[in-house]
Amino acid sequence: MPSVSSDAPLLDPKNDYVFKRLFAQRIDLLTDLVNLVRGGAEPLKLTEILNPHILPEDITGKQIVLDVRALDSRGRSIDVEVQVRAQRDYSARALYYLARSLVDQIGESEAYSKLRSVIGVSILDFQLFREPGEEANGQWRFAMRADQQLDQPDQPPRPPRELEVQLEMNFLELPKLARLGLEKTNKPLYDWC
């Protein structure tokens, strides 16, 4: 049997094939990565890898093929994507994927109470957020919540209120993280990147 050289090049995990093979077969690694990307959010316990295909609602609709799709212990769908090529409208695409994952959960006569949150994790090899002040952040989490009470603007603010069923989007911009000294501020995430 030929020996494997320690000088052999490693496969790039940003490659779709490598990413899918690695994380679709190792739910423990996927769980660790998703929790690190989500930062301080409540940790997830992923329990099942799902079919990554989301079929169109009709023959003219868009078919979605995610890199990895999983379910957590509370029935929430976790959609994970790696995107190497820059796309200016990527955040709209990511939101569309989450919305379709939400819509896919129930059929025509099923109760809305069956809906569970959908959490998206996008690992980007480009800078998505480029506005002034955004260059110092490479890890983002967006969720639907009420930041203020519009009917009582003169009152002290209440804590933000999140909806029970969420569309949560997490973005990790790899080029920024390399610049921002992630090795010192978040070593476990740095080791993944």
Functional labels for PLM-detected ranges:
Residues 1-193:
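Elongated, amphipathic alpha-helical interaction scaffolds
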